């Protein structure tokens, strides 16, 4: 048992998007509004500092007219290796901590629990404008592929790929079609470099347990046993005998 220091090993920037941020206080509450100006429209978000978390009052997608600007915003992302701080922290905490990095969320999960839209909004858009949602998904797929080698070549020995997957929202068919291929792609790159890859599966995983078993993931991070979820530790060990369970 030790401290887990979660750190990125790459830097993200958008060279053709102008970002402005305004932060203010109302009593003891701290708010931030961020605007992203693209050639095809301006996007904004509105969040509140919650101390150990962030309360998200507004995300980027507010109407169907925002899809074009969001596509531009996502396509403009550039990634550069940023290994120095991770390497420094790993050396400094060698005796009592480990450093773990991340690829970010899975492409579809980025649209469910990321910064584009809320989970409720995603469910509505998935039913009403699925083609638009999938246009964002395809951009995110290509973006993640640009990150795989950067992370695999970093000092990080083990890396999470996404998580907070909610099977009640997506169901097993969507999970198999839109999640599994990306675990396979990322794992192939990581394993080629002798690195480990896992995912933050902390929810009711029973209906996707067989699919998880078919992934090349090395560990299941934040597995939460029953009664808090619908799988016991014994059931998880039986379902995933070749994977390390990192208990939540």
Give the ranges of each region predicted by the language model.
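A short, surface-exposed interaction/processing loop segment used at functional sites
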Residues: 54-73
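N-terminal basic, low-complexity leaders that serve as flexible interaction/assembly modules and, when applicable
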Residues: 1-55, 84-88, 94-98, 105, ...
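Active-site loop segments of alpha/beta catalytic cores
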Residues: 37, 68-248
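Short, charged/polar low-complexity linear motifs in solvent-exposed/disordered segments
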Residues: 49-51, 61-64, 216-217
């Amino acid at each position: 048992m030790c401290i887990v220091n979660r750190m990125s090993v790459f830097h993200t920037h958008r060279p053709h998007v102008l970002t402005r941020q305004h932060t203010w206080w109302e009593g003891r509450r701290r708010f931030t509004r961020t605007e992203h100006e693209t050639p095809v429209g301006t996007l904004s978000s509105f969040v509140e500092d919650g101390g150990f978390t962030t309360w998200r009052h507004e995300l980027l997608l507010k109407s169907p007219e925002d899809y074009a600007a969001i596509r531009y915003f996502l396509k403009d992302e550039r990634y550069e290796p940023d290994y120095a701080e991770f390497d420094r922290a790993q050396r400094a905490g060698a005796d009592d901590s480990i450093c773990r990095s991340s690829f970010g969320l899975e492409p579809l999960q980025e649209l469910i629990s990321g910064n584009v839209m809320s989970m409720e909004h995603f469910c509505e858009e998935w039913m009403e404008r699925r083609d638009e949602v999938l246009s964002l998904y395809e951009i995110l797929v290509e973006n993640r592929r640009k990150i795989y080698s950067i992370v695999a070549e970093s000092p990080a020995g083990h890396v999470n790929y996404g998580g907070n997957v909610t099977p009640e929202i997506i169901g097993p068919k969507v999970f198999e079609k839109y999640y599994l291929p990306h675990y396979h792609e990322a794992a192939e790159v990581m394993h080629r470099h002798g690195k480990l890859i896992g995912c933050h599966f902390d929810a009711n995983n029973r209906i996707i347990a067989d699919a998880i078993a078919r992934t090349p993931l090395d560990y299941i991070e934040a597995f939460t046993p029953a009664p808090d979820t619908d799988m016991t530790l014994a059931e998880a060990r039986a379902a995933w005998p070749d994977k390390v369970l990192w208990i939540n």
